[in-house]
Amino acid sequence: MKMIAWMQHFLETDETKLIYWLTFLMVCMVVDTVLGVLFAKLNPNIKFSSFKIKTGVLIKVSEMILALLAIPFAVPFPAGLPLLYTVYTALCVSEIYSIFGHLRLVDDKSDFLEILENFFKRTSGKNKEEK
């Protein structure tokens, strides 16, 4: 019984629950990055690109910074904590879906980076034609 009471002590306040959500999100991000790099290196059909790795890490770091910066803005408001839990849950589900995509448990055919690259190529091509 002492052990259960000790474990419940960690979930008494909302701040500790937020820390656990952030920790879970960070673990999911690390697992997703490691699996992505590992499978890209081991699979000869996938082109290993340092640009994609840097972009992925940059996206994860920016998501974590935004998740941390949202805490001081959300806590003072009554609807802030449920909204923050919703955002953290959505980020965790997104990371878990990405992990499942690496493990080929879900069919994820979208290549967001390719869409962005094509968009920037088209916009930069228009700017060159106008000059």
From Swiss-Prot:
It comes from the Viruses. Pfam families: Phage_holin_4_1. Residues 76-78 are periplasmic. It is a multi-pass membrane protein. Residues 1-52, 102-131 are cytoplasmic. Keywords: Cytolysis, Host cell inner membrane, Host cell lysis by virus, Host cell membrane, Host membrane, Late protein, Membrane, Transmembrane, Transmembrane helix, Viral release from host cell. InterPro entries: Phage_holin_4_1. One of its GO terms (cellular component) is host cell plasma membrane. One of its GO terms (biological process) is viral release from host cell by cytolysis. The chain crosses the membrane at residues 53-75, 79-101. It is found in: Host cell inner membrane. Belongs to the bacteriophage holin family. phi29likevirus holin subfamily. Isoform Holin has 3 transmembrane regions whereas isoform Antiholin lacks the first transmembrane region. This is Antiholin. It comes from Bacillus phage phi29 (Bacteriophage phi-29). The gene is 14.
